[in-house]
Amino acid sequence: MVKETPKISVGDLRAWYGEREVIHGISFDINSNEIFGIIGPAQSGKTTLLKTLNRTLEFTAGSRMDGKVKMDGKDVYGIKDVYGYRRRVGMVAPLPVGLPLTIYDNVAFAPRSFGMRDKDQLDALVQKCLEQAALWEEVKDRLGTLGTKLSGGQQQRLTIARALSHQPEVLCLDEFSIAIDPVTTMKIEDVLKELRESMTIILVTNLVQQARRLAKRTMFMLNGELIEEGETEHRRQIEELLRRRQTLIYHLMMCCS
């Protein structure tokens, strides 16, 4: 049986901000059509890792990286069309990032920039993305309203809809639910479970219960290192990751005190 090529493959990845190394030689694979969880405390390198995957780190002054990142077996950093590649990898930040545009134009912005001009196509795509972000019913009668007029939680869902408008192959979510109420979070989690049928999802979260609900596999990072990786199907495995995390943090604090 031929082994399937991973959707994302990371090999001996290292990253720096200036002289400070923030990711220390980590390697892992992410399969197609899976939700892959990344957990860890603040400053563990999770967000920097996402930036290396969607090639935004190289636009950060003073940053550099070494190692391999592949998508479908091809070297991501060998792709000359950076913006074409980034279209394939959607990114949702922890807090909403709104464009000073209407709700409709926030979602239609990327498709238009990639050449979609047919209004019926745009209308259908805007509705689909807003539905996927659990926002359509709340805004369908005011699509001409500025997105910045929405509540914080609604703006975050608009950010998710905008990321989906790229029709990405990989969707990176960096603690997407931090600004969203629990009910809406559960709605979007249901959507993510459906989306994994058509894309790969990388979920950075500090909520272990969320990783347990969504991720097939989860890896734990600490101080830029990959500490543990494993299946998250069973509660005991997650609890073991937590136990090890608490032990590691305790010893780290003792060493630094």
Where are the regions that the model predicts?
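Short helical segment in ABC ATPase nucleotide-binding domains corresponding to the A-loop/adjacent helical element
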Residues: 54, 104-113, 123, 127
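ABC ATPase NBD Q-loop/coupling interface
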Residues: 68-84, 144
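Conserved H-loop
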Residues: 199-204
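Catalytic Walker B motif of ABC-type/P-loop ATPase nucleotide-binding domains
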Residues: 171-174
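Conserved signature/switch motifs of ABC ATPase nucleotide-binding domains
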Residues: 166, 197
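Conserved ABC ATPase "signature" region
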Residues: 74, 120-141, 254
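Conserved beta-strand-loop-alpha-helix hinge in the C-terminal portion
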Residues: 225-252
